[in-house]
């Protein structure tokens, strides 16, 4: 069983890397200027455009929600909103990659500056919701896998293979058994300029 899970985990990890590496090789943009100083929201939007499944499904279907029940009357207590959803299907494996775009400085990476318990718990909750609703999203199978990811911006302009994502590490809740794939949130750094260039190229088409 452990070997089987390890093979599934490796397969999905490779799929995630393939997704993150889907840059074009003929980018020619030198500089891109956005009309906002609030780059955190720009970063989140570009990640969603680059990796999200636009037009394939209603993203709101992936929003977990809660209800109050008072005197036999129920009322909506609000929703949680994942940044980006990406479905995948290959051979007998089906699943979903849930991406949270975090605008943190790559040079200052340590366990104190990375996403906190609040963000980690939200990602795990998103994973639980998608896992429970897998049949609604067409990804239900004995091998359904849900993959959780944090993406942060970086500047790799002075390094080789600048378009390759850099694996940072992962977060877990140590008190939990973490048997489900979505209970481990992997963190990658993405070259910011490459993402901006790729986003701009898509917008010009």
PLM region spans:
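Catalytic core segments in nucleotide and nucleic-acid processing enzymes
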Residues: 26-205
């Amino acid at each position: 069983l452990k070997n089987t899970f390890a093979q599934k985990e490796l397969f999905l990890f490779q799929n995630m890397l393939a997704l993150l590496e889907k840059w074009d090789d003929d980018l020619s943009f030198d500089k891109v200027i956005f009309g906002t100083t609030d780059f955190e929201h720009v970063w989140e939007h570009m990640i969603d455009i680059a990796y999200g499944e636009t037009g394939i499904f209603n993203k709101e279907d992936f929003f977990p929600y809660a209800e109050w029940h008072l005197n036999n009357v129920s009322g909506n207590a609000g929703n949680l909103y994942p940044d980006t959803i990406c479905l995948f299907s290959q051979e007998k494996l089906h699943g979903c990659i849930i991406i949270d775009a975090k605008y943190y400085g790559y040079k200052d990476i340590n366990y104190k500056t990375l996403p906190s318990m609040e963000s980690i718990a939200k990602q795990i909750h998103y994973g639980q919701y998608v896992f429970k609703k897998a049949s609604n999203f067409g990804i239900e199978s004995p091998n359904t896998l849900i993959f959780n990811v944090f993406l942060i911006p970086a500047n790799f302009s002075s390094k080789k293979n600048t378009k390759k994502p850099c694996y940072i590490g992962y977060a877990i809740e140590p008190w939990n058994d973490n048997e489900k794939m979505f209970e481990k949130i992997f963190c990658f750094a993405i070259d910011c300029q490459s993402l901006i260039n790729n986003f701009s190229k898509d917008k010009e088409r």
